[in-house]
């Protein structure tokens, strides 16, 4: 489904990025092990892709014990807008998400802040980490500080759904899944 959805507006690594995130969220329902979740995402994309190699390099950097600041600084240097990359480039943002998930050590706020503080596509990176990690650790483990600010409300520009309850939308989504043919 992620492939079909992403190909409407993305190509190549943009499509792979969507597939990677969808697979991570799906795996997060089964395990809270961050590396297992990231690798499950990688298992859905081509191992010869630049995205696969970039995310794998971040895992390797983390495994070698490099500090978060060093890892994130390398990403910012390689993909700096001044060297020709756009701030919403899939590869650099996937690297930031990977680093945030790994270096955040399942601390919801720290993980999100590592990604957002690195800049680039801040809203997407924070939301991706929040989605993956929130699923992995469960709603009850998300600190109230983060939940209370949202107040179970989603504001959008989608006609008929401009202000909706997040819990109602989650229930509608679950109902849809349960009614879908297997």
Task: Report residues per predicted region.
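Accessory "access/gating" subregions that flank catalytic or transport cores
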Residues: 3-10, 22-119
């Amino acid at each position: 489904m992620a492939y079909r959805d992403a190909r409407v507006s993305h190509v190549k690594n943009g499509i792979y990025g969507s597939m990677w995130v969808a697979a991570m969220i799906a795996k997060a329902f089964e395990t809270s092990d961050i590396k297992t979740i990231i690798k499950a995402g990688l298992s859905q994309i081509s191992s010869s892709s630049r995205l696969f190699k970039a995310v794998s390099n971040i895992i390797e950097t983390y495994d070698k014990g490099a500090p978060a600041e060093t890892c994130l600084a390398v990403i910012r240097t390689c993909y700096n807008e001044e060297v020709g990359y756009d701030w919403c480039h899939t590869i650099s943002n996937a690297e930031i998400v990977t680093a945030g998930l790994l270096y955040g050590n399942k601390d919801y706020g720290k993980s999100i802040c590592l990604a957002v503080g690195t800049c680039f596509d801040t809203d997407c990176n924070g939301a991706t980490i929040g989605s993956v990690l929130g699923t992995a650790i469960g709603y009850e483990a998300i600190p109230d500080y983060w939940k209370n600010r949202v107040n179970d409300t989603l504001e959008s520009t989608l006609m008929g759904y401009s202000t909706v309850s997040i819990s109602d939308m989650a229930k509608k989504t679950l109902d849809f899944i349960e009614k879908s043919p297997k």
